[in-house]
Amino acid sequence: MIKIKFLKKNERIIYFEITGHANHGEYGEDIVCSAVSSVSQMTLNGLMETLKLDDKLQYKEKEGYIVCDLDKSNLTDDEIEKSQILILSMYSYLKAVEESYGKYVEIRVREV
């Protein structure tokens, strides 16, 4: 199962962590894992390349694991606001995946 955690502070998503594998299909053919991987990579790339936050962004990624902590990234209020567009888009997409494939994806949101 893929477990996704979002932390919110003052109505903003400041942290996300994605762990695990869906095991919905064979390696390389798992549409659930592919969907989650694609949208999370797109979001990280958007934060780093489109918003030019690559030098500030606190993140880590490896096989079956992505974490991004905006709260520890020393971003300006403007950078955090802009990042929310990408992160909220990812969140909406992942919620749709969870609705369709809830056996393989679990999302938790917590206010801090």
What positions do the PLM features span?
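Short, conserved glycine- and acidic-residue-centered signature motifs
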Residues: 32-36
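N-terminal intrinsically disordered, cationic/polar leader segments
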Residues: 1-31, 41, 45-112
